[in-house]
Amino acid sequence: MQLTELIETTVVGLGYELVDLERTGRGMLCIYIDQPAGIAIEDCEKVTRQLQHVLTVENIDYERLEVSSPGLDRPLKKLADFERFAGSEVVITLKKPLDGRKSYRGILHAPQGETIGLEFEGKEGAAMLDFTLADMDKARLVPKVDFRSRKQ
């Protein structure tokens, strides 16, 4: 079983989604998890403990294991991510430029089959970009932070 498959099986088995996995040159393994209710430190601890056991049993070599939430600017990689975050503001970077432009920021529309829509502000007003996962280099949520809503 490959490392990604092993980790995803473990994470999903605990009730979380594997958002991303990074393995650095110095033996560090970074795992990013999520769930609809968000991630708390206890969730990270639970996944860390389970993965430590699984990686030891499977004899996977690593120096350090880090489990965390994907953050406010969560990457979107799977079609299910685009469905879940439809209506959210995102930044999309395409692999190849379209009309001389690779990066777009706008409101995500729910996928229609394999096609994903992004409503953005073009040169002549509101415009729509239709793309597929194959067209996309990367996509991230735009963080929304409201400091004024704090209670006094």
Curated annotation (Swiss-Prot):
Gene3D superfamilies: Ribosome maturation factor RimP, C-terminal domain (2.30.30.180), RimP-like superfamily, N-terminal (3.30.300.70). It is found in: Cytoplasm. Keywords: Cytoplasm, Ribosome biogenesis. Signal peptide: none annotated. SUPFAM superfamilies: YhbC-like, C-terminal domain, YhbC-like, N-terminal domain. It comes from the Bacteria. One of its GO terms (cellular component) is cytosol. GO terms for biological process: ribosomal small subunit assembly; translation. Its main location: cytoplasm. InterPro entries: Ribosome_maturation_RimP, RimP_C, RimP_C_sf, RimP_N, RimP_N_sf. CDD domains: YlxS_C (cd01734). Required for maturation of 30S ribosomal subunits. PANTHER family: RIBOSOME MATURATION FACTOR RIMP. Belongs to the RimP family. This is Ribosome maturation factor RimP.
